[in-house]
Amino acid sequence: MYDYLKGLITRITPEYIVLEQKGIGWQLNTPNPFAFRTSAMEQQIYVHLHVREDAQVLYGFPNLDQRELFRKLILVSGIGPKGALAILATGNPQQVISAIEREDETFLVKFPGVGKKTARQMILDLKGKLGSLLETIELPSTEDELPLFGVHPYKHELEEAILALAALGYSEKELEKIRPLLEDNDKLETTDAYMKQALQLLLKLK
C-alpha cells in the first residue's frame, strides 16, 4: 500500500496532476489540482489507491487530514471517489464536518451528486466519528485568506477553473450563474483562487 509519493509536479490539468519520480510520471486525481504548483523542488503528496474492476486509480492529497476525510467519505453509500473529491474541493473541510455534526442536510445536498438520501446517510455514518479531523484541519474559509501567487489575471485562469468544476460534476447552468461574479472580481488572480471563490458561490446557490 502506498502512503505518499515524493517528486516533481510536472503537469497540472483540471482533473489531475502528474508527479514525476525517478523517471516515472504518476497521474494523481486531486480535489483541486490548481492548489498545487509546478516546481523544481520535490513535493510530497499523500496518496490513496482505489481499485476497480477495470482500473487502478491514484488519488493525491496535500496532507493526511484531507486523505483521511476522503477515505471516510467513500465508505458512505452513494458517495464515490469523484463525489468525495467534489466535497473536498471546497478547500474548507471544516464546513463539511460541521454540517455533518449539526445534521445540516440543506448544506450537504449542495454538492454534486449528493441528494437528501445520501446526505442523511453521510450523517448516519459519520456523525461523531470526525472529531479528531475537525480539531486538526485548518484551511482558509474566506476570500481574504485565499493565497494569491502573483500570477497575471489572464482569462485562461478562470476558464481552467470552470473546466475543473465541470470535471467535479457541477452543471453548465450552475457554472454560468456564477461566471459573471467571478469575472467582476478583480482580486482573483490564480486558477486556485477562482476555484475556491467559485466553490463558495456554488454552495450558496441552492
Swiss-Prot record:
It is found in: Cytoplasm. GO terms for biological process: DNA recombination; DNA repair. Residues 63-141 are annotated as: Domain II. Pfam families: HHH_5 (PF14520), RuvA_C (PF07499), RuvA_N (PF01330). Its main location: cytoplasm. Residues 142-152 are annotated as: Flexible linker. Keywords: Cytoplasm, DNA damage, DNA recombination, DNA repair, DNA-binding. Residues 1-62 are annotated as: Domain I. Residues 153-206 are annotated as: Domain III. GO terms for molecular function: ATP binding; four-way junction DNA binding; four-way junction helicase activity. InterPro entries: DNA_helicase_Holl-junc_RuvA_I, Hlx-hairpin-Hlx_DNA-bd_motif, NA-bd_OB-fold, RuvA, RuvA_2-like, RuvA_C, RuvA_C_sf. The keyword Hydrolase does not apply. GO terms for cellular component: cytoplasm; Holliday junction helicase complex; Holliday junction resolvase complex. Has three domains with a flexible linker between the domains II and III and assumes an 'L' shape. Domain III is highly mobile and contacts RuvB. Belongs to the RuvA family. Homotetramer. Forms an RuvA(8)-RuvB(12)-Holliday junction (HJ) complex. HJ DNA is sandwiched between 2 RuvA tetramers; dsDNA enters through RuvA and exits via RuvB. An RuvB hexamer assembles on each DNA strand where it exits the tetramer. Each RuvB hexamer is contacted by two RuvA subunits (via domain III) on 2 adjacent RuvB subunits; this complex drives branch migration. In the full resolvosome a probable DNA-RuvA(4)-RuvB(12)-RuvC(2) complex forms which resolves the HJ. The RuvA-RuvB-RuvC complex processes Holliday junction (HJ) DNA during genetic recombination and DNA repair, while the RuvA-RuvB complex plays an important role in the rescue of blocked DNA replication forks via replication fork reversal (RFR). RuvA specifically binds to HJ cruciform DNA, conferring on it an open structure. The RuvB hexamer acts as an ATP-dependent pump, pulling dsDNA into and through the RuvAB complex. HJ branch migration allows RuvC to scan DNA until it finds its consensus sequence, where it cleaves and resolves the cruciform DNA. This is Holliday junction branch migration complex subunit RuvA. It comes from Lysinibacillus sphaericus (strain C3-41). The gene is ruvA.
